[in-house]
Amino acid sequence: MGWNEAIKLRSASLPALCLLYVTCALDASGAASYAKEAVITETAGTVRIAADSPRPLEQVLNALQSKYGWIVNYEDPQYVSAVDVIKASSDSQVPSGGSFTFEFSSAAPDEGKTLRQLVDTYNKSKNPGHFELRHTADGGFNVVGTAGHSDKGEIVEQQAPFDLALTLSNKEQTIDETVTRICAEVSRQSRSNVVLAISPRKILFQNRVALGGNKVAARELLSKSLGATHGKIYWRLLFDPESKNYYLNLHLVHGV
């Protein structure tokens, strides 16, 4: 998929993206079926985070960010099996996540150890997808979906879209254009379109970056692009079982 096609798909996909977010909070009758955010409690030296979401692992990461300020990028695997998908309303499908509880010691928790424990605990649960915790060059962390169920109910390894090695000519563009170009190249090489959806548009349009590389991981190129904003931006790469598209949401951390 070329850059121009990526722009068109991005515009056409926004209504579907809005619908995706609305239906994630509804059941077939239109009543709320998931928690808006995870519930955090702390008793007897133990922190307990109770999530209830189509993507409970992401919801726990959001809770950890709220409590400790840990900024962690999150990437869905592909949810393509009936085992990993449920109907949230009469005409939409979402990942078949639900309740998930994570507990850890409240005594000066270490970010890396806690995140490792979280991912390991999640992978042992019955919720959809399997994930890996990845360290970044700047000391941060990515939680990356690496497997999902097949139609036979078996766990099957998947290639994460941002693991793809890209070759891009060095070109100075706005950061919005650069991220869109990265998404377009990932889409061209993979089986799913990757669309830049939610983002701090003003910052991405006002800042420019000269970026390219030969066989560089898409995730690294994305991280360098966002770093050129001189702000703290993290991402959520969400797979929509309905359209089979990935939606890249970028969020600005305020006050950092």
Task: Describe the residue ranges of each PLM region.
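N-terminal targeting/assembly segments of extracytoplasmic apparatus and virion spike/baseplate proteins
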Residues: 1-256
